[in-house]
């Protein structure tokens, strides 16, 4: 099983080929190819490569499927024994990316 751990949008993801992942919004067009080059770890059929901090010889190719918004999160603030209440909602802007290939140079 071939997988990689990648840093993108300030977070780390366990990536496998043929699957799609939701990242924080990436400002690119739909259908465009992207390359992820901040690879922290690669497992290639049992052979493990660890970057210090990144692996320069590994690139991951992906395709942007869609831009979407995440599930709504409600933030409710209230002060006890007062009439102060504040309800606020937030939906995170996301980009869905299909991972096509993990390339090792």
UniProtKB/Swiss-Prot annotation:
The keyword Ion transport does not apply. Keywords: Chloroplast, Plastid, Ribonucleoprotein, Ribosomal protein, RNA-binding, rRNA-binding. One of its GO terms (molecular function) is rRNA binding. The keyword ATP-binding does not apply. GO terms for biological process: translation. Pfam families: Ribosomal_L21p (PF00829). InterPro entries: bL21-like, bL21-like_sf, Ribosomal_bL21, Ribosomal_bL21_CS. It is found in: Plastid, Chloroplast. This protein binds to 23S rRNA. HAMAP family: Ribosomal_bL21 (MF_01363). Belongs to the bacterial ribosomal protein bL21 family. Part of the 50S ribosomal subunit. This is Large ribosomal subunit protein bL21c.
């Amino acid at each position: 099983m071939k997988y990689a751990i990648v840093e993108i949008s300030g977070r780390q993801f366990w990536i496998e080929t043929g699957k799609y992942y939701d990242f924080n919004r990436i400002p690119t067009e739909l259908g465009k190819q992207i390359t992820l080059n901040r690879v922290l770890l690669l497992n290639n059929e049992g052979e493990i490569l660890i970057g210090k901090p990144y692996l320069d010889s590994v690139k991951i190719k992906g395709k942007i499927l869609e831009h979407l918004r995440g599930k709504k999160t409600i933030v409710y603030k209230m002060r006890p024994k007062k009439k102060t209440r504040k309800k606020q909602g937030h939906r995170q802007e996301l980009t869905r990316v299909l991972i096509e290939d993990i390339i090792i140079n």
